[in-house]
Curated annotation (Swiss-Prot):
Belongs to the universal ribosomal protein uS12 family. GO terms for biological process: translation. Keywords: Methylation, Ribonucleoprotein, Ribosomal protein, RNA-binding, rRNA-binding, tRNA-binding. Transmembrane segments: none annotated. With S4 and S5 plays an important role in translational accuracy. Interacts with and stabilizes bases of the 16S rRNA that are involved in tRNA selection in the A site and with the mRNA backbone. Located at the interface of the 30S and 50S subunits, it traverses the body of the 30S subunit contacting proteins on the other side and probably holding the rRNA structure together. The combined cluster of proteins S8, S12 and S17 appears to hold together the shoulder and platform of the 30S subunit. This is Small ribosomal subunit protein uS12. InterPro entries: NA-bd_OB-fold, Ribosomal_uS12, Ribosomal_uS12_bac. The keyword Ribonucleoprotein applies. The modification 3-methylthioaspartic acid is found at residue 89. SUPFAM superfamilies: Nucleic acid-binding proteins.
């Protein structure tokens, strides 16, 4: 434990914030290439087959990201844009794929919350 004098001379060092999406390296989104597209099951009280993709980012980091919405066209070598945002019932999934950009098409037939799923306005 430091003495009062040592604290006066040096002070305490603040810890700093921990990033929730470290692979983005302070960028709002990052581009990447899908290395594997698969389904996985969620944690205990929930049951489903959640669609996820393993993505190698332009900075070389490989992350697991969630594919939101109903149905998708992603496969290996698809180029996608990822953003931060975890999926609470999938351990290790801390990123979301942005729908309607690059190789990922928007959700077909989506009427509500369209901007979140890259769906165009219906005519």
């Amino acid at each position: 434990m430091p003495t009062i004098n040592q604290l006066i001379r040096h002070g305490r060092e603040s810890k700093g914030d921990k990033s929730t999406a470290p692979a983005l390296r302070s960028c709002p989104q990052k581009r990447g290439v899908c290395t594997r597209v698969y389904t996985t099951t969620p944690k205990k009280p929930n049951s489903a087959l959640r669609k996820v993709a393993r993505v190698r980012l332009t900075n070389g980091v490989e992350v697991t990201s969630y594919i939101p919405g109903v149905g998708h066209n992603l496969q290996e070598h698809s180029v996608v844009l990822i953003r931060g945002g975890r999926v609470k019932d999938l351990p290790g999934v801390r990123y979301h794929i942005v729908r309607g950009t690059l190789d990922s098409v928007g959700v077909k037939g989506r009427m509500k919350s369209r901007s979140k799923y890259g769906a165009k306005r219906p005519k």
